[in-house]
Amino acid sequence: MAKLHDKYQETVVAELAKKFGYTSVMQVPRIEKITLNMGVGEAVADKKVMEHALRDMTAIAGQKPVVTVARKSVAGFKIREGYPIGCKVTLRGERMWEFLERLVDIAIPRIRDFRGLSAKAFDGRGNYAMGVREQIIFPEIDYDKIDKIRGMDIVITTSAKTDEEGRALLDAFNFPFKK
């Protein structure tokens, strides 16, 4: 079991219940899922690009990504409906906790010129979205084997009702927010 999951069950639940005055442990916010999304627009011109993106995403997430396709044809972007334009992974359960641990302890500290995560990236319902500019911050990615530096979106979906609750939950996991 991941250390963060143990920490959540042993200390975070009690802290948040006390802070927000919850009467039941089921009211305490929890992380429901983490979604990783990588947009690969260049895949329209070169099919190999998508294979590299899928390989990187598989290494980072520990599970096979789903290829996302264009819903509409857009002449300006030179894409047709059904063209592969990205990939995504939804992590839940044990894999989610292990990824969160790697993200907080290893990947985020490796971001170049890092000054803290923006606290404004909450969506109003306690979910947090962040962007990563380089996939090489993850230790699973071998720098010599990548074809191109690619970024990705990471969305942490929580059961929190407000941004304040969501922030308190992520603060309890030592998320490095800007002060």
Swiss-Prot record:
UniProt KW Zinc keyword: no
Keyword Oxidoreductase: no
InterPro entries per UniProt: Ribosomal_uL5, Ribosomal_uL5_bac-type, Ribosomal_uL5_C, Ribosomal_uL5_CS, Ribosomal_uL5_dom_sf, Ribosomal_uL5_N
GO CC annotations, alphabetized: ribonucleoprotein complex; ribosome
Domain of life: Bacteria
GO biological process: translation
Pfam family, one: Ribosomal_L5_C
Keywords, sorted A to Z: Ribonucleoprotein, Ribosomal protein, RNA-binding, rRNA-binding, tRNA-binding
GO MF terms held by the record: rRNA binding; structural constituent of ribosome; tRNA binding
Function according to Swiss-Prot or TrEMBL: This is one of the proteins that bind and probably mediate the attachment of the 5S RNA into the large ribosomal subunit, where it forms part of the central protuberance. In the 70S ribosome it contacts protein S13 of the 30S subunit (bridge B1b), connecting the 2 subunits; this bridge is implicated in subunit movement. Contacts the P site tRNA; the 5S rRNA and some of its associated proteins might help stabilize positioning of ribosome-bound tRNAs.
Family membership noted in the UniProt record: Belongs to the universal ribosomal protein uL5 family.
Subunit structure: Part of the 50S ribosomal subunit; part of the 5S rRNA/L5/L18/L25 subcomplex. Contacts the 5S rRNA and the P site tRNA. Forms a bridge to the 30S subunit in the 70S ribosome.
PANTHER family in alphabetical order: 60S RIBOSOMAL PROTEIN L11-RELATED
UniProt name for this protein: Large ribosomal subunit protein uL5
Organism: Shewanella sp. (strain W3-18-1)
Gene encoding the protein: rplE
